Amino acid sequence: MPKYLAGPGGVAQGELTVPGDKSISHRSLMLGGIAEGVTDITGFLAGEDCLSMLRSLQAMGVRIERPEEQHVIVHGVGLHGLQAAAEPLDMGNAGTAMRLSMGLLAPQNFKSTLVGDESLMSRPMERAAVPLRLMGANITTHNGRPPVEIQGTPLKGIDYKLPVASAQVKSAVILAGLQAQGVTRVTEPAPTRDHTERMLRAFGVKISTEGPKVTIEGGQKLKGTQIQVPADFSSAAFFMVAGCLAASEKPLILRNVGVNPTRTGLLQLLLQMGADIKIGRAHV
């Protein structure tokens, strides 16, 4: 077993931009794919998880350009414009992509099969499948795990209380509700990240949040937009702590970090401990 020795540190100063937020990159691709018009994404996280989502959308007929590694242009096909893929959709190791895709594809008028790598094929998927089935979805898992087989069918809105707080399950139900008949309401037992809700509003969708309840009416169209994916807060966290601990004469500046209140628990804790952190305009 390898051993590591940590010695006294030096300075931690200068400027740094960490990679983009994976959750927002996933949702940017997915929502851009079902929007009408073009969605221009900068700051995209070009990691394998997000690229698995990108390739899956391409397999369903979405034209996607990549002028640069972190710059993606999605030509949306509209809410009902996706096409059946010729082969199973390989989500790699991306659990977020698989669970959100379950909600996205359950109301479509074709059959889909979702698979992944060895790790993803062992993860539970029933928590996302259960509420979707209550909406009328035809979803089959294998002992609760992938492959996930989806026979698209019309859905109806429901009122659903999440038994366990999960942003992924909440988002899957919201995406299904976006395409369902009637109104869908999701109530969560504890706050989770609300990227999906915020981003749907950016695409022109009316979605309301009242305390723990999220409400969306089906049939709304998305309009292509411009998205700047913020730097990932979790990736920035290590450097935030290092900057707080190091005895540096000059500051450490982390550029374009997303400070969604549902993700900044560490920031609040450091401030309570007396850390000298200044927050710029919607960024750390």
Model-inferred region functions:
Residues M1-R281:
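Structural preference for solvent-exposed beta-strand-turn elements
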